[in-house]
């Protein structure tokens, strides 16, 4: 076997007949499979042992030679080689066809490859191949033309007229001869000449033909190989026949298809031998052609061949295609051993890097390790008895188990794995029961809850795998989300409400104004009921020597609460004392207003002091981010565990409950509803009098009811008591929000009808009062729509993620610095007056391209090529800088990836990104993962005339990344200049906008309903939109340059995500958009070998031009092209990656003709061939690092399996 990690690339091509024969171990001559009595394979049949190898390991068919010592001997009686039965998975056979047969992929594909080579239409080809017409092969001296088609009758007439002076044949044999006659070089040269003057349809066809002829010339494939004389037979173990209970057999469809081919082939041979009449032979040849077509791609032409129960048979093509095909089912995703799955349960007592593993699962997963340990300790004599001990659950086993799993990390995965945090490593802790325990804080990363979710567990076996799991994948390392760099492990639900309850302040509680020496004394008072957690007290600052107080503050008394004193105990020792939930408190310590002046009375101070709000969920998250920034992984994970324990403990102590009595009536509600009803009546009256249109009426009615609902909500908030448990729940961020409360105590408001439009009939009741039957019915539409939307959204979003991953999977950080001299100028992204993404978010964690200067003083804030951290970013924003030029993936020069400088900081660690980081996949996951949170609907801005529906949410993202023509398209100007006039033309319902540029004047016609973005007298730059709507990037790239198109797309994607409250870093979107812009289309090939109209990588184009320029010739010109992600993924340089993505047969057909070479650069193609992926520790730079041998060599699982086999043989 070749070592899969050694070879560099993989090539695909057309197989010549000789090649197919050289692969084969023998010809399959009979359609038989196995003998019905002996169940042994039949000789010369589809399962013949002489061709494909023995069915039993090291045993020939007749049983003369058994055992491994005869390995390699061919039995003189039955002719079977004595070898491992595994060879039946790799040895191929062949069938010698009695007549040539065309390969359906090359004849039927779009465009038909045979048709292009021969310059014949697919229809003519079909007529010839399936024996409907003759084709002239050699016209001789007759007036016929080569490749002319003749019907049966015409052929007979011509034969009578000219005799043997011309040659015409039918069937694949004729096509084979025509293909063999093609002089590729000559045809290509003629086409190149023709291209110089050809235009339109003719030119397109010429380019396509030239492309395919060049492919044949360059690859060395011969066109006649598209017609086959021999077909290979797949190894039998890949198309097995198995006995079911009840004596019946189940077989792969391929055996049926091969059988039909063999039957027809044998019949044809017999007919030819008998010299049967031409028409019978022709018919048999056609049937053979159809049988081979069905074998290769059943259903591609005509009706598919059906098996029992009218089910179409699965052909060779179907084995590769689709989710269940070879690529996606077996090569990209395999089932692995040493894995299990179970229901998950909450493990509140676990540490962040632990998980609870049920004992029965541990016994099974770590079996070989336990057996090794039992033998090593002398508790079992050999591996076999150790195995018996485990099966008996002997006491010795449990003594060993603890030690075996200690320090052996396991991986936990929850499907769907939407981002890389869907698989994390934990240290197992044994637990009783059958469910696995999961740490509550990692639930948000997995999107897990404990209502019956299941998770899968995997055991990394090798030392390297364990080391990687521990160092790179341990849950404690995954505190920040790679999507936006914010903490993803933040407390939720009980933990939040516990910490909220404990940091609440209250006026006039028992013991208010007591002054304590330190936290311990305050705790003592609390435990003895002198004070409550919410009591405001004083404490001497001198009790906190390590905390960063100012010298002035150190001698004073600080006002805080008992709960906050206890909360600050869990903070790192030298972290600021947290007394109020503000950023200033975290950064600069406690504000001076919380300190008593010497001699000041604390009771007097408390009379006037306002209550400080408690710590909510968002603040806890900020706190975690700051702790992580300062102390990194270990301290943060300990802090997280303390926050979790404290939260759970305090929420238990608090005894918070909710009941009907917590919901109060709203006395003002009838009055508010009455007012709204009157308004609606008035609006209806206006409509009846014709003062407003129906659309306006609808808008206003909806508005009136929405205002009423908002008013009810505001009144509710006014009446709300801070101690109301429902209020505490929503205010702290533990669960629910104000709108839930409005529906309980206020009114439900307007509902959506099944068609997505809002109904004018509001639900006036709330759940506390109860809904009427009609109201209940109206509400049910919305609920049902919500469920179906979610289901559809999941599928759409999953497919989007798959396409994104596919297009970006080969983007890896490959070098430190690409040395580019271009950068990206960034400003805050706004939409009108609305801020979409502030400058701070755009520059933080990026490298500067140019130095940044203060616009007022002119002093340098940040130099060039510096990584901007939070502090610098804040400085830049505070100085009033509006534009910063940063390094960006858009302008990075690294091939097949990006460099560290252009990428910037790794969001998941907060440090510089390291070479080998698979940033493309991370980017795709970061964009795809929140896809399910995006809305599925287009936002209806309502029916007001001219306000076209603007696509939002998931459909808009798909529109952008697939580079489709957007809905509600904006017209852009192609000239820079002044808007001279905007004239309305009511008769044709249009507006004409005239723009006068320096050299020319353009007039654009828009519909009268369009909402203008420009006014007369405005000066606008080319590429600017004239009306509201989305710009088509394909137009923009022609009018402006690539960078401005990329910037536009980036701002659009960010607009959609930020509208939904989802933060997403620019760099992820940049990587995806860069992948869409990798190609150029050659316009004029100059003196290069390129073809006009050819799509190619920018880097390849540059290389071709470089060589031409060095030789002193004319370079080619090309224009940039924007491809949708599906198209971009299919256009990748790797045929393996493209074939495993979509349109498998088309990709492989094309790759084979071109003799494509897959350089194995991306991750996917390496996974497919089983090579270690070239990212992370798999990069060549890291691959050659050898660890020092220190301890005894570790045993492997293979050793144990071998031992077991040995012991079996001895027994």
From Swiss-Prot:
Pfam families: RNA_pol_Rpb1_1, RNA_pol_Rpb1_2, RNA_pol_Rpb1_3, RNA_pol_Rpb1_4, RNA_pol_Rpb1_5. Disulfide bonds: none annotated. Binds 1 Mg(2+) ion per subunit. Binds 2 Zn(2+) ions per subunit. Gene3D superfamilies: 1.10.132.30, 1.10.150.390, 1.10.1790.20, 1.10.40.90, 2.40.40.20, 2.40.50.100, RNA polymerase II, clamp domain, RNA polymerase Rpb1, domain 3. It catalyses: RNA(n) + a ribonucleoside 5'-triphosphate = RNA(n+1) + diphosphate. GO terms for biological process: DNA-templated transcription. Mg(2+) binds at residues 449, 451, 453. PANTHER family: DNA-DIRECTED RNA POLYMERASE, DNA-DIRECTED RNA POLYMERASE SUBUNIT BETA. DNA-dependent RNA polymerase catalyzes the transcription of DNA into RNA using the four ribonucleoside triphosphates as substrates. The RNAP catalytic core consists of 2 alpha, 1 beta, 1 beta' and 1 omega subunit. When a sigma factor is associated with the core the holoenzyme is formed, which can initiate transcription. This is DNA-directed RNA polymerase subunit beta'.
């Amino acid at each position: 076997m070749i070592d899969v990690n050694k070879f560099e690339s993989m090539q695909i091509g057309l197989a010549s007949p000789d090649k197919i024969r050289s692969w084969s171990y023998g010809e399959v001559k009979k359609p038989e499979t196995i003998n019905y009595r002996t169940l042994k394979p039949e000789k010369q049949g589809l399962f013949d042992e002489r061709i494909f190898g023995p069915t039993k390991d090291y045993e020939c068919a007749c049983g003369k030679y058994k055992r491994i010592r005869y390995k390699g001997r061919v039995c003189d009686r039955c002719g079977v080689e004595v070898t491992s039965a595994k060879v039946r998975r790799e040895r191929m056979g062949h069938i010698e066809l009695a007549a040539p047969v065309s390969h359906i992929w090359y004849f039927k594909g779009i465009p038909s490859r045979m048709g292009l080579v021969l310059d014949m239409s697919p229809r003519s080809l079909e007529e010839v191949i399936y024996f409907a017409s003759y084709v002239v092969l050699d016209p001789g001296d007759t007036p016929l033309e080569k490749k002319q088609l003749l019907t049966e009758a015409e052929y007979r007439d011509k034969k009578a007229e000219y005799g043997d002076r011309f040659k015409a044949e039918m069937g694949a044999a004729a096509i084979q001869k025509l293909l063999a006659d093609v002089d590729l070089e000559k045809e290509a040269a003629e086409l190149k000449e023709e291209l110089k003057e050809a235009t339109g349809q003719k030119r397109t066809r010429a380019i396509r033909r030239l492309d395919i002829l060049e492919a044949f010339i360059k690859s060395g494939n011969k066109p006649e190989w598209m017609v086959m004389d021999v077909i290979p037979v797949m190894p039998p173990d890949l198309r097995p026949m198995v006995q079911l209970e009840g004596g019946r057999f189940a077989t792969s469809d391929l055996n049926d298809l091969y059988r039909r081919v063999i039957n027809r082939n044998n019949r044809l041979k017999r007919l030819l031998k008998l010299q049967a009449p031409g028409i019978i032979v022709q018919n048999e040849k056609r049937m053979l052609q159809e049988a081979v077509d069905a074998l290769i791609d059943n259903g591609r032409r005509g009706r598919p061949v059906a098996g029992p129960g009218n089910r179409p048979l699965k052909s060779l093509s179907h084995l590769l295609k689709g989710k269940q095909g070879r690529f996606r089912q077996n090569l990209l995703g395999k089932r692995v051993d040493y894995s299990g799955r179970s229901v998950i349960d909450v493990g509140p007592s676990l540490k962040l890097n632990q998980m609870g593993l049920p004992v029965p699962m541990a016994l099974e997963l770590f079996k070989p390790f336990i057996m090794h340990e039992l033998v090593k300790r002398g508790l079992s004599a050999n591996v076999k008895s150790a195995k018996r001990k485990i099966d008996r659950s002997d006491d010795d086993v449990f003594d060993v188990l603890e030690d075996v799993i200690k320090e052996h990390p396991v991986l936990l995965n929850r499907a769907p794995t939407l981002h890389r945090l869907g698989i994390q490593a934990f240290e197992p802790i044994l637990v009783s029961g059958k469910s696995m325990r999961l740490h509550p804080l990692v639930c948000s990363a997995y999107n897990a809850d404990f209502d019956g979710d299941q998770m899968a567990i995997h055991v990394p076996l090798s030392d390297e795998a364990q080391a990687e799991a521990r160092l790179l994948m341990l849950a404690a390392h995954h505190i920040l989300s790679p999507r936006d760099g914010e903490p993803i492990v933040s407390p939720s639900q009980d933990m939040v409400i516990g910490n909220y309850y404990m940091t609440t302040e209250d006026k006039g509680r028992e013991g208010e104004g007591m002054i304590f020496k330190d936290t311990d004394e305050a705790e003592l008072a609390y435990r003895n009921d002198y004070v409550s957690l919410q009591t405001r007290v004083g404490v001497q600052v001198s009790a906190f020597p390590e905390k960063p107080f100012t010298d002035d503050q150190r001698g004073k008394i600080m006002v805080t609460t008992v709960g906050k004193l206890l909360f600050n105990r869990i903070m790192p020792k030298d972290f600021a004392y947290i007394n109020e939930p503000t950023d200033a408190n975290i950064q600069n310590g406690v504000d001076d207003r919380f300190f008593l002046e010497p001699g000041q009375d604390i009771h007097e101070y408390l009379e006037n002091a306002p209550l400080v709000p408690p710590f909510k969920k968002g603040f806890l998250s900020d706190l975690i981010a700051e702790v992580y920034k300062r102390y990194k992984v270990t301290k943060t994970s300990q802090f997280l565990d303390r926050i979790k324990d404290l939260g759970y403990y305090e929420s238990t102590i608090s005894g918070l409950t909710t009941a009907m009595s917590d919901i109060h009536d709203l006395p003002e509600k009838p009055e508010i509803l009455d007012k709204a009803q009157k308004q609606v009546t008035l609006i209806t009256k206006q409509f009846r009098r014709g003062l407003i249109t129906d659309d306006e009426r609808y808008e206003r009615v909806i508005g009136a009811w929405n205002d009423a609902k908002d008013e009810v909500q505001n009144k509710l908030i006014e009446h709300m008591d801070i101690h109301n448990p429902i209020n505490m729940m929503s205010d702290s961020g533990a669960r629910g929000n104000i709108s839930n409360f409005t529906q309980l105590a206020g009114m439900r408001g307007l509902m959506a009808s099944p068609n997505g439009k809002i109904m004018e009939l509001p639900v006036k009741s709330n759940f506390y009062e109860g809904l009427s039957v009609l109201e209940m019915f109206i509400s049910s539409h919305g609920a049902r729509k919500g469920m179906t939307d979610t289901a559809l959204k999941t599928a759409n979003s999953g497919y989007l993620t798959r396409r994104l991953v596919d297009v970006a999977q080969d983007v890896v950080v490959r070098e430190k610095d690409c040395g580019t001299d271009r950068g990206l100028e960034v400003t805050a992204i706004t939409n009108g007056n609305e801020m979409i993404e502030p400058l701070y978010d755009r520059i933080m964690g990026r490298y500067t391209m140019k130095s940044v200067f203060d616009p007022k003083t002119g002093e340098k804030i940040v130099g060039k090529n510096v990584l901007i951290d939070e502090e610098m970013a804040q400085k830049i924003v505070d100085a009033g800088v509006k534009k910063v030029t940063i390094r960006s993936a858009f302008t990075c020069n690294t091939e097949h990836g990006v460099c560290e400088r252009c990428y910037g900081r790794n969001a998941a660690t907060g440090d510089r990104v390291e070479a080998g980081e698979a940033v493309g996949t991370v980017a795709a996951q970061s964009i795809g993962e929140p896809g399910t949170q995006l809305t599925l609907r287009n936002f209806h801005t309502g029916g007001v005339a001219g306000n076209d529906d603007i696509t939002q949410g998931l459909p808009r993202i798909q529109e952008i990344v697939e580079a489709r023509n957007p809905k509600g398209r904006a017209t852009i100007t192609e000239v820079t200049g002044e808007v001279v006039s905007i004239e309305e033309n009511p008769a044709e319902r249009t507006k004409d906008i005239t723009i006068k540029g320096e050299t020319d004047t353009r007039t654009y016609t828009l519909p009268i309903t369009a909402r203008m973005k420009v006014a007369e007298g405005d000066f606008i730059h080319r590429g600017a939109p004239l009306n509201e709507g989305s710009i088509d990037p394909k137009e923009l790239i022609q009018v402006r340059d690539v960078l401005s198109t990329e910037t536009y797309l980036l701002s659009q994607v960010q607009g959609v995500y930020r509208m939904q409250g989802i933060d997403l870093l620019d760099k992820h979107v940049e990587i995806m958009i860069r992948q869409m812009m990798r190609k150029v289309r050659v316009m004029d090939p100059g003196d290069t070998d390129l073809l006009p109209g050819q799509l190619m990588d920018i880097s390849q184009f540059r290389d071709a031009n470089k060589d031409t320029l060095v030789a002193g010739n004319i370079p080619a010109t090309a224009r940039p092209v924007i491809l949708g992600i599906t198209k971009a993924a299919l256009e990748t340089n790797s045929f393996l990656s493209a074939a495993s993505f979509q349109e498998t047969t088309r990709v492989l057909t094309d790759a084979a003709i071109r003799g494509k070479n897959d350089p194995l650069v991306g991750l996917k193609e390496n996974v497919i061939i089983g090579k270690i992926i070239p990212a992370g520790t798999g990069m060549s730079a890291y691959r050659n690092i050898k660890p020092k041998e220190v301890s005894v060599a570790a045993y492997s699982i293979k050793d144990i399996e071998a031992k077991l086999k040995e012991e079996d043989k001895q027994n």
